[in-house]
Amino acid sequence: MHLSPNDSNQYRYLTLSNGLRVLLIHSDTAQQSAAALAVNVGHFDDPVDRQGLAHYLEHMLFLGTEKYPKVGEFQSYISQHGGTNNAWTGTEHTCFFFDVTPSAFENALDRFSQFFTAPLFNEEALDKERQAVDSEYKLKLNDDSRRLYQVNKEVINPEHPFSKFSVGNLDTLGDRDGQSIRDEIVEFHHSQYSADLMTLTLFGPQSLDEQQAWVEAMFADIPNHQLSGKSINVPIGTEDSTGILVQIEPIKEFRKLILTFPMPGMDKHYGVKPLSYFAHLLGYEGEGSLMLQLKSKGWITSLSAGGGASGSNYRDFTVSCTLTPEGVDHVDDIIQAVFQYLTMIKQDGMNEWRYLEKQAVLESAFRFQEPSRPLDLVSHLVINMQHYQPHDIIYGDYKMSGYDEDLQRSLLQYLSVDNVRVTLIAKGLEYNRTAEWYFTPYSVTPFSSEQKRFFQQIDPRWQFVLPEKNPYICYDLDPMPFENGGSLPELIEDLEGFRLWHLQDDEFRVPKGVVYVAIDSSHAVASPKNIVKTRLCVEMFLDSLAKETYQAEIAGMGYNMYAHQGGVTLTLSGFSQKLPQLLEMILRRFAAREFNPTRFETIKQQLLRNWRNSSQDRPISQLFNALTGLLQPNNPPFATLAEALEEIEVDELSTFVESILAELHVEMFVYGDWQRQQAHDMATTLKDALRVKEQRYEEALRPLIMLGQNGSFQREVHCNQQDSAVVIYHQCEDIEPRSIALYSLANHLMSATFFHEIRTKQQLGYMVGTGNMPLNRHPGIVLYVQSPNAAPAELVTSIDEFLNAFYMVLLELNDYQWHSSKRGLWNQIATPDTTLRGRAQRLWVAIGNKDTEFNQREKVLAELKKLTRADMIRFVVNELKPRTANRLVMHSQGQAHIDAPRIHLGQEIGSIEEFQLRPKDCGLG
């Protein structure tokens, strides 16, 4: 097996007697164990009259087995032992995965293995979970991506299984005359879930021999029906599915143009990755690129290439553009430009050195590969096992074995006018069809011969240029020598308006680094209008950088700038050798900043559209946005931002930036394999660009509205959607480690029980959960439900009943369950950083939180260790019981429940401005 020299794991690949392929992974340092099983069965395998059956089966396997019959037992066991679990159903595969504390791994595996040998398919659970599947379907009825996907299913070959309805609902999964859904799901599981279609991956600190013994004992009984090598013999396309324009009406306000080129399946070419070559050239964003020239015309705002649906016998290659309103009127011109660029590639762009550049980038990424989270690792590799040869399971994603011009040119033939399907997504077009299941309006029109001739013309207005050699690619990479230093960040510059933190990494020893720069300014967040100006400036700056930074991103470096409650933060990450060069270039662009009126108008309209579109988001998302906007004055809700943006003009921005520069406070963190002097050098570059001298400006305050001892507050948000939703937030008044431990443990203990009670048992909705929700360093806990079945008043009643009874759940836990739950949370909090970037982020958060001793985590763990069951019961009764709790209830009454009784509890929040006059905690960071 081809492994990275940076990979310290031990691997063993084997095939069980029943044909199940297994990958075992041992790590000496693993703090968590994980497993994933994938089966080569998906919605393509659904019976035509039972569409959604594979998805329904995926749900049912979690709900009881012969050995462990209790519904929800698996999830409770995993949750109590510090783990998580999930699954997904795709076109041709279904994947199940979980992680858990290592001491519970054997028992968790035993429960997991029963899914595939002896599921119960309990009648009551079948009926309730069918409701959950139906709720999941209804949840996505207004989801544009799902609505567009359905149209794609209708314009390809109707005989191909891609055309099937994948989710299922009450209609497709109900009992019928003479047809019991239970009989059919049992038969589907028995006939389709064959061991020779399965792959299994385990990860943990257990030895490979121990893991192998478990696997052989638990998974060898899965039956083998000799199904390996199954294939799809129906082509995905017909003559009518290319050479057409498909117009689709979205729900949200956006415009997109997608050119789709159907191709044969590409699995056999994974070791060459021929399509990535074309994706890079078409997606290039530098001078002379397709994107830049279309952008300069004011027709598009972004362009990407290479993505698209893929399966065992098909692969779509797409070129996708986000259009401006003017771009909708120039669709044929944009298509013509794409084909002219493709002609240039055919004539001048077939060069081995371009392939070798991409190969070098992937080889560096593989060589200095950093560990993934155990759950991410097993769920990724178990799918790789379905596609790659055993020796390439780890390496296959990075493998580029050599330039094959004959193969490249053969694939270029598919990128033709006769083999394209163009999809235009925009409002206000002509539609004469309605898609099944999601009711999407659309139309299909064949291109005329005149249009096809136009698409193939060479137009002199396009001055396209292919990318030059990439100056950012690093061919000779090794970590820099390690200077003697501590293991924690050190403050190496401490000026009035500037602080520089530095740490040279001594653990991961990879030639990578991360730079954070927080630019705080009270002026940047002084009003909603200033907050919007700050975001506008950030978006315009990022827009101006794209053409110069694209090559750096291709070479394994990344950057971002984002606005927050105190100002803006700039981050850079990637290979350290040339990251200072990227920082210097970004700062040079900042010094020469200009606010182009045309780009300003485009970006302004883009932001307006995004913020207005939020009114079409799921009700639960709108409630969370309204909640944070209510409690964090420096983080207004989207509607407030959109209103403020309407008034802003381009000529206001230059003086606005100058006023920020006149009173800013900068904090910088340089972490990676850079030595101290290099950190000073980067800081000097930064201070020169931002004109940082000896200013005496402080960091901006981040106010948080405190609920105080006032019982329940409630506010209704009008979402104009079918579903109702409720979010209940409990706020902690202090930021002490003990409080963090209490809120974290409460959430950890109640999450699985709440899910089981509200979703599995009561079937109130598909989106159900609890979560930690710290705001401005204050711990908080949130409970939420979005429901097609119940109005907010009923949802709040159900949540309150759960909270009122939860202390009984705690009393009924035996000592083993109590200590296992604490240990599970302990392991989650104490999990060591697995990547350099992950550690950088944790240390940066500590710097922002003024945890300058970097020991907040240890303090929380110490408090967690001390917590008793009596402490937790006291906390639940005193802080979470609805009658006495200080909380904020956000709710939205769906159209389906418009006549249901309204919520009447606590103090209703009418005016946001008045509510925000309440006492605030104005902290830093």
Descriptions of predicted regions:
Residues 1-15, 233, 485-492:
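Short, Gly/Pro- and small/polar-rich lid/capping loops
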Residues 10-26:
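Mature N-terminal segment immediately following signal peptide/propeptide cleavage
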Residues 25, 30-43, 53-54, 71-115, ...:
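M16 family metallopeptidases and their MPP-like homologs
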Residues 124, 130-138, 143-197, 201-216, ...:
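Hydrophobic, small-residue-rich alpha-helical packing segments that form membrane-like cores
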Residues 138, 227-287, 375-393, 398, ...:
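His/Glu-based metal-binding/catalytic segments typifying zinc-dependent metallopeptidases
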Residues 184-217, 650-686, 885:
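Non-catalytic, conformational "gating/processing" segments within enzyme and secreted inhibitor domains
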Residues 212-228, 682-696:
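Glycine-centered hinge/linker elements that transmit conformational signals in sensory
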Residues 411-414, 418-484, 631-642, 655-717, ...:
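Long, compositionally biased intrinsically disordered regions
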